[in-house]
A protein has these predicted regions:
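Post-cleavage N-terminal segment of exported redox proteins
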Residues: 1-48, 162-167, 188-202
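Electron-transfer interface patches adjacent to heme c in soluble/periplasmic c-type cytochromes
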Residues: 13-22, 80-184
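Short, solvent-exposed loop/turn and secondary-structure capping segments
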Residues: 27-32, 69-71, 76-81, 135-136, ...
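Sequence context of c-type cytochrome heme-c attachment sites
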Residues: 32-43, 53, 69, 88-98
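Electrostatic cytochrome c docking/interface patches
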Residues: 36-60, 72-79, 104-106, 174-177, ...
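The canonical Cys-X-X-Cys-His
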Residues: 55, 61-70, 120, 187, ...
Length: 202
């Protein structure tokens, strides 16, 4: 087929472009859904607890993902700094995933357990109290905002429809778990849960 015939007919060129993109997309995407390692949780991966889930939503609402990633790349420097590189099975319960796109601040995929709860609270209230050169904003209002138990239960029901294995008991007990907790405590709980749960040596 002469290329001039295609170039002179916009509808034909558009149709051929759509066909090529569709085939390319299928070739790239479909195999991923056939790999169990991509769609199955990795060893030790569990759904977020009620307080962690509330904290994850605070993390998203405050735009933390704009400056922090949650994906350790398989590069020597990153593995030495942050720990085991991220694997697909770690994020199967993340809706939406929190890979992020820019590292103004450090990667948080392995931050759980590195610092105390108190350190995180001080850091979130005024980052420069613990990291003098930090350009992170202070989130002082989180200590005043309370977690809404009804909202957490509703989110857990929605996530269950998306495939997260929350039980009826998990949802019923969520109100008791989060009642009386501030958004600051919820965010700290979420951050403390960000760690590699796979088997040693993997």
């Amino acid at each position: 087929m002469n290329h001039e015939i295609i170039e002179q007919r916009a509808w034909l060129m558009g149709t051929l472009i759509a066909i090529v993109i569709s085939i390319g997309g299928l070739v790239e995407i479909v195999p991923l859904y056939m790999q169990a390692s991509v769609i199955s949780p990795s060893a030790g991966t569990k759904p977020y607890g009620a307080l962690q889930l509330a904290g994850r939503d605070v993390y998203v609402r405050e735009g933390c993902y704009l400056c922090h990633t949650q994906m350790v790349r398989p590069l020597q420097a990153e593995v030495e700094r942050y720990g085991h590189y991220s694997i697909a099975g770690e994020t199967v319960y993340d809706h939406p995933f929190q890979f992020g796109s820019k590292r103004t601040g450090p990667d948080l995929a392995r931050v759980g357990g590195r610092y105390s709860d108190e350190w995180h609270k001080i850091h979130l209230n005024n980052p420069r109290d613990v990291v003098p050169e930090s350009n992170m904003p202070a989130f002082i209002w989180l200590a005043k905002g309370m977690v809404d138990p009804a909202e957490v239960a509703a989110k857990m029901r929605v996530l269950r429809k998306l495939g997260v294995p929350y039980t009826d008991d998990d949802i019923k007990s969520s109100a008791e778990v989060v009642t009386g907790h501030t958004e600051l405590e919820a965010l700290v709980s979420y951050l403390q849960g960000l760690k590699y749960n796979g088997e040693a040596g993997q």
